[in-house]
Amino acid sequence: AGCHAEEIALHRNASEALETVIFGIELNAGDEVVLAKQDYPNMIGAWKQREKREGIKLVWVNVELPSEDENYLVKKYTDAFTPKTKVVQVTHMINWIGQKMPVRKIADAAKKKNIDVLVDGAHTFAHFEFLIPDLNCDYFGTSLHKWLGAPIGTGLLYVRKEKIKNTWPLFGAGDKDED
């Protein structure tokens, strides 16, 4: 994975890992989250729950797929960024059609605007050769049973070290460490 052990948390699957971030990071009413209509339904449902409960705003990217034009794909996301955008979720590979998204380019653009990047890597971890930190994302969730061949019920969450202290666990477990 290319990251430090303290940046990794084991989960039951990608959905649980990603929902730990979706429900565990602080967002305020009016803050915007950019995501795509092609994202996995569980993740969309989790974001919609936060929208309904807390008044965050979901900004939808609708890309025409498949596409071999990475610049087009990046532009669809970056055009959705505003000064209120706090998070962008990018699905590394859209499972419906196998479209691999240019995560690093989207993340680089987001970082220039101080936007956190959450990557759904359920269909790329151990399928393609890459290191999570090379994606320049803050959070990455995956299921280990797919391409890694680990037992069903194993998932992984990567949280960039400096983001750990501001990410609450999905399930409480006593006092939270400062880092």
Over which residues does each language-model region extend?
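Pyridoxal 5′-phosphate
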Residues: 1-179
